[in-house]
From Swiss-Prot:
Enzyme class: transferase
Organism of derivation: Methanococcus vannielii (strain ATCC 35089 / DSM 1224 / JCM 13029 / OCM 148 / SB)
Primary role: Catalyzes the GTP-dependent phosphorylation of the 3'-hydroxyl group of dephosphocoenzyme A to form coenzyme A (CoA).
GO-annotated biological processes: coenzyme A biosynthetic process
Protein name per the record: GTP-dependent dephospho-CoA kinase
Catalytic activity as recorded in UniProt: 3'-dephospho-CoA + GTP = GDP + CoA + H(+)
Length: 158
């Protein structure tokens, strides 16, 4: 289990990729993290391979996603943490070649971007929300995986 530190929280406030207000198409394997981001993609006809959701935005505002996912998994992940359960589930999901899956998080999904980048293959597109700015779109690369490893090392581990 990883616990967010102030140092890592400061780093995570900066987008890891380009920020978009709109996104109408994207190629290849797509992982969407966050409810508003997923809702935007689905409303534009983009069905992510995996959507990671907690059905809330800004920690407590409910978000309705009018979409029936093909396969749904659940995981517990408290705010400010990356739980062992979430890590194991993301590892498992990274091995499945399927589309339209959802990982429903009881707690908070924000930090799960880190294990997604760590475990999903290079060239996977990861899209997550940057509060009050838009959606961050990035491709997983070897360099990005190394950056994530460093951030995880800077978190408190239990």
């Amino acid at each position: 289990m990883y616990i967010l530190t102030d140092k890592v929280a400061t780093e995570l406030k900066k987008p890891f990729g380009k920020v978009y207000k709109e996104l109408n198409s994207i190629e290849g394997k797509v992982i969407s993290i966050g409810d508003v981001t997923t809702k935007h993609l689905l409303s534009n006809g983009i069905v992510p391979d995996l959507s990671i959701l907690d059905f809330k935005t800004k920690r407590n505002v409910p978000v309705e996603i009018p979409h029936k996912f093909k396969t749904v998994f659940e995981v517990y992940n408290p705010p400010g943490y990356i739980s062992d359960e979430a890590i194991e589930r993301i590892k498992y999901l990274s091995t499945i070649d399927d589309r339209d899956m959802a990982l429903i998080v009881k707690g908070e999904e924000d930090l799960l971007t880190l294990p997604v980048i760590k475990y999903f293959p290079e060239d996977t597109s990861v899209i997550y929300g940057q509060p009050d700015e838009g959606m961050v779109v990035l491709k997983i690369t070897k360099e990005l995986k190394q950056k994530i490893e460093k951030l995880l090392k800077d978190m408190e581990e239990r």
